[in-house]
Amino acid sequence: MKADYNTYYYIAASKHFLTQEEPLEEILREKTEHFIANNKSIDFWIFDSTKLNAHSPNEIKTLQKTFFFPTILIISSNKKFITWLKLRLRYIFTDKIQLAIKL
């Protein structure tokens, strides 16, 4: 049986940079409040490379290994949201990934 793949978009950056030098918590809190106020489903997920475990998607674990430092990934099915984050944050990497699971 062939798995269905879904396209997700992501940003990746140093964990230290996103948690210590950028207002990531504030940005995500504002976006979450916006989603709730507009009755939209929250469609982003945060993966911390230092906290991945056996239950984490294999594709995410493989992607995290491409970075040589502790990394935060923010993944969404909403390309506009990732573009918005890219404009708000500095020193980040963006791309897309095909996942055989639905987040």
Curated annotation (Swiss-Prot):
User: Is Nucleus one of the keywords?
Assistant: no
Task: List keywords of the entry alphabetically.
Answer: Chloroplast, Plastid
- Membrane-crossing residue ranges in chain numbering: none
Report the subcellular localization: Plastid, Chloroplast
Pfam families assigned to the protein according to its UniProt record, in alphabetical order: Ycf54 (PF10674)
Plastid keyword on record: yes
Single GO cellular component term = chloroplast
**Alphabetized Gene3D superfamilies for the sequence:** Uncharacterised protein family Ycf54 (3.30.70.1860)
UniProt similarity note: Belongs to the ycf54 family.
* Protein name (database record): Uncharacterized protein ycf54
Q: Which organism is it from?
A: Cyanidium caldarium (Red alga)
Phylogenetic classification of the source organism:
Eukaryota, Rhodophyta, Bangiophyceae, Cyanidiales, Cyanidiaceae
